[in-house]
Each structure stands twice: as C-alpha cells, then as structure tokens.
C-alpha cells in the first residue's frame, strides 16, 4: 500500500503547483500549533498535579538514629521517628535541619533551606551608609580609637595574630544626645566595607516570653552569615539597665533578653569577622555585666564639641550650603558653647530658612547669628519648662 502511495505521488505530485504549496504551508502551520498545544497540555497537567497534591509538613531534625531513621519534631505537634527517602543524602541531615515530611507516610522527602526571620532580616542595611570620617567634626581622637578597635581587626587581622594579642570584641560609645555616636558607627561601616546591621535595643524588648532572646540570637546568626559585619545596637540602655528584682513579667523578659545578648557576645572569638558597637546616653545605669572585660572592652566617650570642634562642624555643614563668603567661624563657635553637633546642624538649617524667608538664595552671617539666638531661646524655654514641672 505504501509503495502504491509513493508511486502515485511520484506521478501526480507537482511541487510547483500553488495549491500544493499552500497545502504544505498549512500542514506545517498546523503541525507547529499542535506541538504548542501539546506543550500547553503538559504544563496544565503539571499545574493540576501541584494543585491536587497534599501539602508537606515542616519538621526540625532532633537526632539521627543508627538504623538510618530520624527523630523529628513536627510543626503539627508531636515528635516522630520517620524514614528518609532514598533520594535524600542522609549526610546532609543534622540536628536543627529543616525538612519536609509527607502527610501520609511521614517520610522525609526534602531538606529545606535555612529560614531567615523577615523581622531580623530587616535590620540589615543593604546600602552602605554614605558617611565618611571627613563628615564628622571635632571627634578626631574618637575616630582614631574606633578605627583601631573595629576597622583595623576587620582589615588586617594578621597584625594581631603576629603580635599575639586579641582585639576587643565590642565598643561602647557614650555621651550626651546629638554628639555623633551614630555617625561614628555609620562611618566605620562605610570605611571598612562591612555589612552593617543596625538595631535599636528597644526592638529586642518583645511582648511574648522568649521572643526577645530569639531575636537577639537570630541577629547574631545573621551577622555570622554576612561576615565581615558590624552589629550596631543603639540605645542599649533599653535592655542593658542594671537588673533589679521587680518581679514583673516584663522586667523578667528584659533580663532574659540581656542574658541572651551577653551569651552571644561571649560566644564570639575576638578575631571573628563580627564586631559589635553599642551606643547609650546613660552609661551610669548600665548593668556592670555589660562592661566587664571580654565584652565591651573599649569605652569611648563622645563629648560635646569644644571650641575647635564647633568651628570644624560649622565648616562641614556650611561648605555644603551657599553662603556670601563672609562667615566668621570663630564667632559662631564662641556663640554656641554647650551646643551638640546636632544642634549646630539645626542652626545651619534654620539659617537657610531665614535666608529663604528674606528672598535670598544664600546664607550670610546675620542669618546664622539669628538662628543661634533662636535655638538658644528654644533650649532655655525647654529648661525652664522642665524646672517648672519638677516643682509642680
């Protein structure tokens, strides 16, 4: 039959016939369409299987038995002794591993990747802070100290190994508000090219029992994975105040969180690529356990700027602004005795507003003096209010 068909084609087939060419093109088009429909059908079959398949149960490996079975703690409740699927390498299983179990046979069919808490992950600063040492005025001594303690061990650990000393694990920055403690930490992170993990200590104080300690533990696990890294804990007095026996559940939870923090600090080797910086305005209320050798070894005071420091801070901020060129930095520094770096920044910002109100596109000396007087009046009013409330 096939020979007869081939013979018929040989006699009657004419490839130059336009009708034949049209039919060939049509057949080719239909063949391609059929292939695409088959692919779509296979895709829909796969999706249907996924929709109908029962979900897996998440579990944590507790122990591996000699006979190859595994003890797991199921997310649904009880501890189970389960088998391991043949396509799973049992060497990959270890206590603490996350695995997936089938619902019916409770067999381990997949090893899950380590899970990162989204709340903890949000502490990591993805983009490096755009703050450099040149942006900080009046703190040259503090900059040199923090570079020796944080930056040098991260960049040149071999120096410490060769001499045979251990660099400090952590640095505690203390001083009045607005003196540049956070700026120092950001500048170190920028200059050392380390992952910067910033957290306010009050975020460790959680509502539920054990939650704060868990977050502390996971923050330091994140720091180890992202090493070299710097963990910056701002306002550490929120959880690091001296422990007192008040008996309230909230106080006990804060104490548990503090003990977890101390345990994590003690767990680091000095030359690990993880450094800790903490900042506080209240050194006097911190628990002595935080300040003992081996934890926050180096205490760096960040005081209010002196005369030369205030001049330098004014130069840093005013060089970014448009001025008339007749700025007397010595006069500005003498008028702002007792001002912090943050207050000097407020003076420059207020001077800019005064210039805008007066219809100018630049700042002059008069604007700055007016701004200083305004900030002083505001500070005096706040002090008088505090004094009045104290004796009411």
Curated annotation (Swiss-Prot):
One of its GO terms (cellular component) is cytoplasm. InterPro entries: 26S_Proteasome_ATPase, AAA+_ATPase, AAA_lid_3, ATPase_AAA_core, ATPase_AAA_CS, NA-bd_OB-fold, Nucleotidase_PAN, P-loop_NTPase. It is found in: Cytoplasm. Residues 19-53 form a coiled coil. CDD domains: RecA-like_PAN_like. Belongs to the AAA ATPase family. Consists of three main regions, an N-terminal coiled-coil domain that may assist in substrate recognition, an interdomain involved in PAN hexamerization, and a C-terminal ATPase domain of the AAA type. This is Proteasome-activating nucleotidase. It comes from Sulfurisphaera tokodaii (strain DSM 16993 / JCM 10545 / NBRC 100140 / 7) (Sulfolobus tokodaii). The lineage of its organism: Archaea, Thermoproteota, Thermoprotei, Sulfolobales, Sulfolobaceae. The gene is pan.
């Amino acid at each position: 039959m096939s020979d007869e068909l081939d013979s018929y084609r040989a006699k009657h087939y004419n490839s130059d016939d336009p009708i034949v060419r049209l039919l060939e093109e049509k057949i080719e088009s239909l063949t391609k369409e059929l292939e695409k429909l088959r692919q779509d059908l296979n895709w829909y079959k796969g999706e249907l299987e996924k929709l109908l398949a029962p979900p897996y149960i998440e579990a944590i490996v507790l122990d591996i038995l000699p006979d190859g079975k595994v003890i797991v703690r199921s997310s649904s409740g009880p501890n189970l002794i389960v088998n391991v699927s043949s396509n799973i390498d049992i060497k990959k299983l270890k206590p603490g591993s996350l695995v997936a179990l089938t619902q019916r046979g409770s067999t381990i069919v997949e090893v899950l990747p380590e899970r990162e808490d989204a709340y903890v992950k949000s502490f990591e600063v993805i983009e490096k802070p755009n703050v450099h040492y040149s942006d900080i005025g009046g703190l040259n001594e503090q900059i040199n100290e923090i570079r020796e303690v944080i930056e040098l061990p991260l960049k040149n650990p071999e120096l410490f190994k060769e001499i045979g000393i251990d660099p400090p694990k952590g640095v505690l920055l203390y001083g009045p508000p607005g003196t540049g403690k956070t700026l120092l930490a950001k500048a170190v992170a920028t200059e050392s090219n380390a992952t910067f993990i910033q957290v306010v200590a009050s975020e460790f104080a959680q509502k539920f029992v054990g939650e704060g300690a868990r977050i502390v533990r996971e923050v330091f696990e994140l720091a180890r994975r992202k090493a070299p890294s710097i963990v910056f804990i701002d306002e550490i007095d929120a959880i690091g105040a001296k422990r007192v026996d008040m008996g309230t559940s909230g106080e006990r939870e804060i104490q548990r969180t503090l003990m977890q923090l101390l345990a994590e600090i003690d767990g680091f080797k000095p030359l690990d690529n993880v450094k800790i910086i903490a900042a506080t305005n209240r050194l006097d209320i911190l628990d002595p356990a935080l300040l003992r050798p081996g934890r926050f070894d180096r205490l760096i005071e960040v005081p209010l700027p002196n005369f030369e420091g205030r001049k330098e801070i004014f130069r840093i901020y005013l060089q970014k602004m448009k001025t008339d060129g007749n700025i007397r930095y010595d006069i500005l520094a003498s008028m702002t005795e007792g001002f912090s770096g943050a207050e000097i920044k407020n003076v420059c910002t207020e001077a800019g507003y005064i210039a805008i109100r007066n219809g100018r596109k630049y700042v002059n000396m008069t604007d700055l003096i007016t701004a200083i007087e305004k900030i002083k009046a505001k500070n005096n009013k706040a002090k008088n209010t505090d004094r009045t409330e104290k004796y009411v």
